[in-house]
């Protein structure tokens, strides 16, 4: 199962680096920072589906 370490997040500003991740909400996040901030916003209910676009 794919996983991402989000212990350093949320961060106030994310880089523009594009390395897409697909969340359990079937939404593509542009990079780990954007994904981890969304995980924080979801109180941990959002998980990683897989690396790459959904």
UniProtKB/Swiss-Prot annotation:
Which cysteines bridge via disulfide bonds? 6-36, 14-33, 22-54
Q: Kazal-like domain spans which residues?
A: 4-54
> Which molecular-function annotations from GO does this UniProt entry contain?
serine-type endopeptidase inhibitor activity
Localization = Secreted
Q: What name does this protein carry?
A: Ovomucoid
Cellular component aspect of the GO annotation: extracellular region
- What InterPro entries does the record point to? Kazal-type_SerProtInhib, Kazal_dom, Kazal_dom_sf
Question: Any signal peptide, and if so, which residues?
Answer: none
Q: What is the lineage of its organism?
A: Eukaryota, Metazoa, Chordata, Craniata, Vertebrata
């Amino acid at each position: 199962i794919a996983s991402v370490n989000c212990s350093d997040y949320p961060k106030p500003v994310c880089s523009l680096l594009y390395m897409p991740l697909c969340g359990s909400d079937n939404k593509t996040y542009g990079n780990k920072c954007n994904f981890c901030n969304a995980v924080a916003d979801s109180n941990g209910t959002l998980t990683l589906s897989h690396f790459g676009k959904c």
